[in-house]
């Protein structure tokens, strides 16, 4: 079996980065929830 986690910083940013979150309504909801919770880091 191939490993399921293949680290790739570009893919990581594209999928989970701040601008990726801001691009959609649901992504903005995620950021708002993390701000509400008081997370130190909002995104990767």
From Swiss-Prot:
InterPro entries: Ribosomal_bL34
Gene3D superfamilies per the UniProt record, alphabetical: 1.10.287.3980
Keyword Ribonucleoprotein (UniProt): yes
Keyword annotations of the record: Ribonucleoprotein, Ribosomal protein
UniProt superkingdom: Bacteria
GO terms for biological process, alphabetical: translation
Recorded GO CC terms: ribonucleoprotein complex; ribosome
Alphabetical list of Pfam families matching this protein: Ribosomal_L34
GO molecular function annotation: structural constituent of ribosome
NCBIfam families xrefs: rpmH_bact (TIGR01030)
HAMAP family hit by this protein: Ribosomal_bL34
Family according to the record: Belongs to the bacterial ribosomal protein bL34 family.
Name of this protein: Large ribosomal subunit protein bL34
Gene: rpmH
């Amino acid at each position: 079996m191939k490993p399921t986690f293949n680290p790739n910083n570009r893919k990581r940013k594209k999928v989970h980065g701040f601008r990726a979150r801001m691009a959609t309504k649901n992504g903005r909801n995620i950021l708002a929830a993390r701000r509400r919770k008081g997370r130190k880091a909002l995104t990767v």
